[in-house]
Design a protein with these regions (language model features):
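Short, surface-exposed loop/strand segments
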Residues: 2-8
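Detector for repetitive beta-architecture
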Residues: 3, 15-17, 26, 40, ...
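Right-handed parallel beta-helix/beta-spiral solenoid domain characteristic of secreted/periplasmic
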Residues: 12-58, 89, 100
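Short glycine/acidic-rich loop motifs that flank beta-strands on beta-rich extracellular proteins
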Residues: 32-38, 57-63, 90-95, 113-118, ...
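Short, surface-exposed polybasic-and-hydrophobic patches located at secondary-structure transitions
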Residues: 61-75
Length: 183
């Protein structure tokens, strides 16, 4: 119930459902960007998120404030972001208290962040997540098996890549990739 601040959290090692208790339930995401190798939520087993708001509060970095940046890393465990998830963050550059608020990139990663995973990935998204980059594979990490990415009834997602993203090291998928879009 209410608001819970999420800086860095590793989910329990059992299948977990994170469900808001009422309309005021919010996850207050601190600034964590995959490009910095940082995450807000890292899975240690299957996770379903439902009936909660992703609220990306700002962090003041000298002259800019960054809104809308969170990173969820599934590490190959099943991740479901259900239709009851809503978002609250700016989607355009805004000025608050005379400072520019830059929109930032959010990430949902099926594989690992700067790590290879030995299994496959399974990510399902049933809601709009503007400004979000969705990777079925890893970011700077390979996936040794199959990738499954299902996106349904999601009015808007910034960028979808069924495989991975390689910047510092390989991000290969050594299996089949299944990408389902249903709108």
């Amino acid at each position: 119930l209410g608001q819970v601040s999420v800086d860095t959290w590793t989910s329990p090692t059992v299948e977990t459902t994170l469900r808001g208790g009422d309309e005021n339930a919010e996850l207050l995401f601190e600034y964590c960007s995959a490009s910095d190798g940082a995450y807000n939520i890292s899975l240690a087993d299957a996770l379903t998120i439902d009936e909660i708001k992703f609220n990306c509060n700002y962090t003041d970095y000298f002259f800019s404030r960054y809104y809308g940046t969170y990173t969820i890393v599934a590490n190959g465990y099943p991740l479901v972001i259900a239709s009851g998830v809503q978002y609250s963050y700016y989607t355009a550059d805004t000025i608050v208290d005379g400072k520019t608020c830059s929109t930032s990139s959010c990430y949902v990663i099926g594989g690992g962040l700067d790590e290879d995973i030995t299994g496959g990935t399974h990510v399902e998204i049933y809601t709009s997540l503007p400004l979000t980059y969705v990777y079925g594979g890893g970011v700077n990490g390979s996936v040794e098996s199959n990738v499954y990415l299902h996106i349904e009834n999601c009015g808007k997602i910034q960028h979808v890549r069924a495989g991975g993203y390689a910047n510092k090291k390989d991000a290969k998928v050594n299996g089949n990739i299944t990408l389902d879009f249903i709108n």
